[in-house]
Amino acid sequence: NNETTIPVISLSMPYENWFGEEEGFYNKIREEISHRVHVEYFDSTYNEYFYVNSKVKLGGNWSLGYPQRTLNLNFNKDENGNKNEKVKAHVFGERMMLGNSNQRLTDLTRFRLHNGGNCFEERTGFNDAILQNLMYGTNASTTAYRPCIAYLNGEYWGLYSIREHYSDTYFEDNYGVDKDNVALYELKGKITFDDGNDFESKEFMKRIDNFLKNDFSNDQIYQSFIDKVLIEPENAKHKMII
């Protein structure tokens, strides 16, 4: 019965999955551990509500050791591996699709509850979200953000950020690209495959490695890289400048 001006998300699963000695998120800091969690969402007016059973994994790097853990929620499939219908909700308010400025971002299959990352210790918790919002409208892909209140098994767990998660479905939700045609790579010391369809990763990495051995001050080599790897120069410029 408490009033709130921001959305509320409630997460429920067995106590052992949160705090157990074997696979509890608050005892074992391992990204590969996953559980099933019941998620309930209420907007600030209580006019919009949904619930879904979701896969949940820990996210983050250094921030994995903080009292609030980043939680990656994926409800694309049920516990039997069957595909779920997308959740239709205005979780990100008035945010529009990046690939279609006339359509609001409403169809969801995953998002993350973000603890603020590296700025958690400074007690701000929204530095990254502010940067993403400043980037919105440029040619760089950004993730939507909305603050929320979180409850774990009915216990108040503080302020979190609801964030889009870079994934195969992110590009499907924002740009209309079939997720089966998406391969997402991540740079953590080295480039590794992260999500999507790994059908051409070895060939892709081979092409990248070969190109990076060249001298890009040569106009012909630079243009060949743009044409063959299909990088859009304006997008790359915006990303690097920001």
Which residues does each PLM region occupy?
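Regulatory N- and C-terminal appendages and interdomain linkers associated
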Residues: 1-59
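Short, glycine/acidic-rich beta->alpha junctions
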Residues: 31, 126-127, 140-144, 233-237
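ATP-dependent phospho-/nucleotidyl transfer catalytic cores
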Residues: 88-110, 114-118, 123-124, 161-242
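Extracytoplasmic low-complexity repetitive segments enriched in small/polar residues
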Residues: 2-5, 67, 82, 106-109, ...
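A conserved alpha-helical element in kinase catalytic cores
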Residues: 120-140
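Carboxylate/His-rich catalytic cores and anion/metal-binding grooves
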Residues: 34-36, 40-100, 144-195
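Loop/turn elements at helix/coil->beta-strand transitions in domains of secreted/extracellular proteins
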Residues: 5-6, 108-109, 139-143, 155, ...
